[in-house]
Amino acid sequence: MQRRKGATWERELAAHLRSEGIQAQRGIGQARRSSEVPDVDVAGWWIEAKRHQRTNPKAALQQAIADAAENGEGRIPVAVCRDNGQPLQAATVTLRLGDWIQLVRDRRIVDTVAKGFV
C-alpha cells in the first residue's frame, strides 16, 4: 500500500507541476534500471517526493542529496513532502541553504536584466 500511495503522490505532483507550465514526469526507472532516478523528473532538479502520516523533510532531503550525488548529473536535490490528509497546496519544499541562496542570486540577476539595470 505504501508503494502505491507513493506512486499516486508522485503522479499527482508531476501533474500539478505540468499544470503550472513545468515539464515534469514521474520517474519510473527504479524498476527498469539499476541506478536510481528522481521520483519526479524535472530538468535540473532531483526531486524526492514523500507522503506519509507525518513526513520527515530532513530525511527526504538527505535521500535526495545522496541519490543526486550518485546519479544526479549536477541536479539540485529537493524534497517535496506532504502529510496524509493535507491538500497538495500544503506540501512543503526543502532544499539546502546554499542551493536556495543560488536560486535567489539567479533570480536577482534575471530581475535586474529584465528591469534594464545591466
Can you annotate each of these PLM segments?
Residues M1-V118:
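Catalytic phosphate/metal-binding cores of nucleic-acid and nucleotide-processing enzymes, i.e., regions
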